Amino acid sequence: MAGDQSVIWQEGPWEHRFVPSNGSRFHVVLAGPDDGPLVVLLHGFPQFWWAWRHQVPVLAAAGYRVAAMDIRGFGGSDKPPVGHSTPTLTADVGGVIRSLGSGTAVVVGHDFGGLLAWSMPVLEPDVTRAIAVLGAPHPVSLLRVRNSLTPLTRAFITRIQVPWFPERALRERDLVTRVITAASAPGRAVPPEEIAAYRAAMSLPSVAHTSLEHLRWLVRSTPRPDGRRYLAAMSRPITVPVLSVRGGRDRLAPAAAFADDAEHVHGPLRTAVVPAAGHLLPEEAPAEIADLLLEHLATLP
């Protein structure tokens, strides 16, 4: 499937649509009734919307309008060479919600999609009803504990700061397989179709580069004015309902990384641990994650 766009357009109980937002075009997978409450799903690295394939039909069957979008730089969405800051990507999500005609949405994010979910109530409060975050500490908490992240995570973040060599490894040296395997719980047999889909999506033009740019911004921006402004904004309290879930066998984000999250939430906060799962929660624990999301959604006013 290398370089084959069909991996992005996989068929299922959903429809594919391009949605304009923030001066760009985004590929969004939609399911559920048009008048249902909107739930936006944001994937992590090195994935695309397909990471949510198990949850999309479950949430839609429960009456929600589900939008699983490819984040800027991934999948079928636009891949500009620059402009991959967290505030920009957060504005992308806000624009998609507006373009879909919904007043507000519950934003669910995994991995760095979770960092965007955390950012939504602060940077896009008018369209954010609630959030759910999987495997992602609050951005300020993450900065505080970055030295206590696992050696695996620190090594990856350091290596991708070098230009071009990580891109080549993603395209040609099977780095995608290694990342997916490392992010899974120890001993997990990663389904071959999962590896094949993510390798194919990473081999699409420009994706190996643009998919890394947000991760690079997170590191490089911390001493710069744009990064300091973002972190200052994220110090404001979050008042919308929050669900935070982590995997009990997550080798990338240890439990200590989440310890300060409650300091940033001044509204309802529920935390949960999926004991047998690693970092790839939507795929390692599809039923458990669907149930947790449905429980969270059911509590919202």
Language-model segments: residues:
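Conserved HGGG/HGGXW glycine-rich cap/lid loop of the alpha/beta-hydrolase fold
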Residues: 30-76
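Charged catalytic carboxylate motif
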Residues: 51, 92, 210, 288, ...
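Catalytic active-site module of serine/aspartate enzymes centered on a nucleophile-bearing elbow/loop
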Residues: 268-301
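A short, glycine- and basic residue-enriched loop/turn
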Residues: 48-49, 115, 278
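Short, hydrophobic alpha-helix immediately C-terminal to the catalytic nucleophile
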Residues: 53, 118-122, 290
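Flexible "cap/lid" subdomain of the alpha/beta-hydrolase fold that forms the substrate-access gate
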Residues: 2-17, 24-31, 67, 74-108, ...
